[in-house]
Amino acid sequence: MLMADPGQLVSVSHMSLDPLSSAMVEEAGAYPINRGGAEQVYLMHPDLVLAGTYTARASVDLLRRLGVDVVEVPPADRLQDVAAQMRLIGAALGHPERGEAMARDFEAQLAALPTPDQAIDAAMYYPNGYTAGAGTL
């Protein structure tokens, strides 16, 4: 939503309306939602679909067979991976300069954070969350 031109987005994931999953709940409310099913998404006539690599394979494959351009965005396993996602999404939306600017800003803010003197162990628990482990953010 931050990188798209006005009118460029047709729909957003239902997860974007969940305050436990999205930092842009209010903005997402301005768009029709989808649940990621190929039939529902196809009927919205998109020319591009941004999908996570964990999106149902059948949906991604069917959309591609129907001629829809699908760009898969891998999950961020580390904070450093977020900048790569920004660049990928910016390029996919036809705004690589926006993706690059956002990624550089993110990297600068990340670099400005203090580095702890030693590793810190932490555990996270929250409703509807995911289990954290090796190789996760």
Regions flagged by a language model, labelled:
Residues 1-54:
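A short, structured surface patch at a secondary-structure boundary
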Residues 4, 132-136:
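C-terminal lobe and pocket-closing loops
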Residues 21-24, 85, 135-137:
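Short aromatic-enriched loop/helix-cap "lid" or pocket-rim segments at secondary-structure transitions
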Residues 58-133:
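Extracytoplasmic substrate-binding proteins
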